[in-house]
Amino acid sequence: MNRATATINVTALKHNLSQIKALAPKSLAWAMIKSNGYGHGLVRVAKALSDANAFGVACIDEALTLREVGIKSPIIVMKGFYNEAELSQFARHRLGAVIHCSDQVSLLEKTNLTSSLSVWLKIDTGMNRLGFSVEQSPAVYNQLKTSSSIQKPIGLMTHLADADNENKTFTELQIKRFFSVTEKMIGPKSIVNSAGFFAYPNALVDWIRPGIILYGISPFGINYNSFKEKIEKKFRPVMTLSAKIIAIKNRRQNDSVGYGCTWSCPEDMPIAIVSIGYGDGYPRHAPSGTPVLLNGKICPLIGRVSMDMIAIDLRSQPNAQVGDDVILWGEGLPVEIIAEKAGTIAYELLCKITQRVQFIEIEK
């Protein structure tokens, strides 16, 4: 079979959650599994993370998918609801909602629900995306407190905009704003994402929201080294993306390789054609020199990434054969490195894996 393969190590996924819980024993873990479990498979990840205290998803469709397969854990929908039909489904399926705009408050007031709703009030402390301003939040909180449609206490949350930056000034300001505005509010609090989890221990409050770190990937990329050793020691990559060599060619000096003739052989040399391309989710903008792992050794990508194939330099691997597995990222080759080479972030690479890729689960 020549399809690219994403091998998902569910044991590593469980291990990563246990590490998070051990590092924040006083907090409950709200596992972020939005965007198809960060590309790892929504249902697969939810079933593996049964020890999570709750799940976070982006939209109601993701939440309903989990309920349909029998996931009974609390689920919080980060974008909340947008009409009466959705709101009714929230109540029917026991979904928690993030309340971030006045339209949602109005819907709550005019809709008769069959059961009360668990909600989190989102306070915008500086992300300037979703949420009520610091100035608006006390009034909205008091308004929600009077609603018979809402379970008490009301959750209180914010989102950190710059927690992966070594300059802590803005994030510390956000945390200060949040603590100040919620000082007289009663309810569970949640502040940190994966980066905040490591960098801001003072913000490890009632609930933490680990995302990318669940999948064994640093939220800091490769440029922020303060937590590099800790992350590498305690967390394991969950996804390994691999593909097979489908052809080996001996090329002459100055022969060009791939579309656009952007790379030429510096000498007579062997190259391998690997069965993966941007049609599978491998980044088209990965440049020549981007590493892959073949038989435990690094080989460089050469030429442009095609829809279905890439070419790699085999000069360091004269014994490579058709059928050998090539690791594009994962165990032995962090996806953060590939993201850096391609000028993007690991999150994007994981979420762009396409349906053509075969997913395999292992326990290792």
Curated annotation (Swiss-Prot):
Substrate binds at R129, M307. One of its GO terms (cellular component) is cytosol. The active site is at K34 (proton acceptor), Y259 (proton acceptor). Pathway: Amino-acid biosynthesis; D-alanine biosynthesis; D-alanine from L-alanine: step 1/1. Pfam families: Ala_racemase_C (PF00842), Ala_racemase_N (PF01168). InterPro entries: Ala_racemase, Ala_racemase/Decarboxylase_C, Ala_racemase_C, Ala_racemase_N, PLP-binding_barrel. GO terms for molecular function: alanine racemase activity; pyridoxal phosphate binding. Its EC number is 5.1.1.1. It catalyses: L-alanine = D-alanine. GO terms for biological process: D-alanine biosynthetic process. Its cofactor is pyridoxal 5'-phosphate. Belongs to the alanine racemase family. NCBIfam families: alr. Catalyzes the interconversion of L-alanine and D-alanine. May also act on other amino acids. PANTHER family: ALANINE RACEMASE (PTHR30511), ALANINE RACEMASE, BIOSYNTHETIC (PTHR30511:SF4). This is Alanine racemase. It comes from Coxiella burnetii (strain RSA 493 / Nine Mile phase I). The gene is alr.
